Amino acid sequence: MALTNEDIINAVSEMSVMQIVELIKAMEEKFGVTAAAAVAAGPAAAAPVAEEQTEFTVVLAEAGDKKVNVIKVVRELTGLGLKEAKAVVDGAPGVVKEGISKDEAEAAKKALEEAGAKVELK
């Protein structure tokens, strides 16, 4: 009478961990294999889908020729005083706003570019 898969599974489930380890070693020796997990070769994996960025940073790369206009826009966007906004513009490249939504970042970029600045979103 041949053993079924169910008989073998029941026998193994009643074994201790040490007995299972010994069984695996014996099977490796008998069949000349190792119990290392085989890597399945499936169909080519599609490129991983990049998570869409949810928080953006508006970086003033260059103030351009119209610094006064850029300072005004920086003040509107950040709520900074004149002196602080001028320091941001004079210190370009630098962060204007960070941790904001995509829509807010694009609106800030558009406003700064219309004022004459060069802007990057990160």
UniProtKB/Swiss-Prot annotation:
Keywords, comma-separated and alphabetical: Ribonucleoprotein, Ribosomal protein
Superkingdom to which the source organism belongs: Bacteria
GO biological process terms, semicolon-separated: translation
GO MF terms, alphabetically ordered: mRNA binding; structural constituent of ribosome
InterPro entries, per the entry: Ribosomal_bL12, Ribosomal_bL12_C, Ribosomal_bL12_C/ClpS-like, Ribosomal_bL12_oligo, Ribosomal_bL12_oligo_N_sf
Residue stretches spanning the membrane: none
Coiled-coil annotated spans: none
A cellular component term, taken from the record's GO annotations: cytosolic large ribosomal subunit
Function field: Forms part of the ribosomal stalk which helps the ribosome interact with GTP-bound translation factors. Is thus essential for accurate translation.
Entry similarity comment: Belongs to the bacterial ribosomal protein bL12 family.
SUBUNIT field: Homodimer. Part of the ribosomal stalk of the 50S ribosomal subunit. Forms a multimeric L10(L12)X complex, where L10 forms an elongated spine to which 2 to 4 L12 dimers bind in a sequential fashion. Binds GTP-bound translation factors.
The protein's name: Large ribosomal subunit protein bL12
Biological source species: Azotobacter vinelandii (strain DJ / ATCC BAA-1303)
Originating gene: rplL
